[in-house]
Design a protein with these regions (language model features):
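Anion (oxyanion) recognition and catalysis
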Residues: 100-104, 134, 169
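Metal-dependent phosphoesterase signature
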Residues: 50, 60-97
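Conserved Lys-Pro-Asp/Glu-containing loop-to-beta segment of HAD-superfamily phosphomonoesterases
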Residues: 143-169
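Asp-based, Mg2+/Mn2+-dependent phosphohydrolase catalytic module
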Residues: 8, 139, 162-220
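Substrate-recognition element of Asp-dependent hydrolases with the DxDx(T/V) motif
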Residues: 86-91, 95-126
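Active-site neighborhood of HAD-like aspartate-dependent phosphohydrolases
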Residues: 2-71
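A short, structured active-site edge motif that brings together acidic residues
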Residues: 54-57, 110-120, 126-151
Length: 220
């Protein structure tokens, strides 16, 4: 599901035939600090002191006592519908700065998120997501809500989900891991901050353009 397109700042209008490198950028855990905000909400949900909930979690939040998918979805539903989770997330430092730099340099920013996995609350999730992007000044060309991110057609993915990274890499895509406690087993390329992500993208830029140029010539 692609919601829309927009430009912020001096982003230039690009056609589908341009050689602009498309960055597939995840939101939660990459641009938005999902786990710190969810930790606050979980402390309220469980009626416990936040210090009892470790900030070092794995995917699924079992460290907080979440035992199955139903419990995870119940907490997530409460967070989205009663605490405006996606509207109140703090931005990960550097996300706006470096995405703007990349946008100004001609990279196409494609935000890709799987926030619609809980039924019946899609409208709230979409609205909160758009408002958060606007509030934090995150530049993007496309906003896509999808589970299977390899179908988006990005050249470089920035992702924190270990499952998504393994899937993307197994299919031949360049997936940069945004490191956190959920993905400690994922190897390079990875970085734990946006300055590191920016450097990796630029280290791969020439190779990506070399790969795409012959294809563009065949199309012309």
């Amino acid at each position: 599901m692609t919601v829309g397109r927009r430009k912020l700042g001096p982003m230039t209008v690009q056609s589908e035939s341009d050689l602009s490198i498309v960055l597939g950028v995840d939101l939660d855990g990459v641009c938005a600090d999902f786990y710190s905000r969810m930790r606050e909400i979980a402390a309220e949900w469980f009626e416990t002191n936040i210090d009892r909930l470790t900030p070092q979690v794995s995917y699924g939040l079992s460290e907080w006592g979440i035992k199955n998918q139903d419990q995870y979805e119940s907490l997530h539903r409460f967070a989205v519908t009663q605490r405006d989770l996606f509207r109140t997330l703090r931005m990960i430092p550097g996300a706006r700065k470096y995405l703007r730099k990349l946008s100004d340099e001609g990279f196409r920013i494609r935000i890709i998120t799987h926030r619609l996995f809980i039924q019946f609350f899609h409208a709230a999730a979409v609205q909160q997501t758009i408002e958060w992007l606007d509030k934090n000044g995150i530049p993007y060309w496309d906003l896509c809500f999808m589970k299977d991110k390899d179908q988006i057609g990005a050249d470089i993915y920035i992702e924190d989900s270990p499952e998504n990274i393994v899937r993307l890499r197994s299919r031949g895509y360049l997936a940069i891991c945004f490191g956190n406690s959920t993905n400690t087993t994922i190897g390079q390329p990875r970085a734990t901050n946006w300055s590191g992500i920016y450097r990796i993208i630029h280290s791969k830029k020439d190779h990506m353009l070399d790969v795409r140029t012959p294809l563009a010539k065949r199309r012309s």
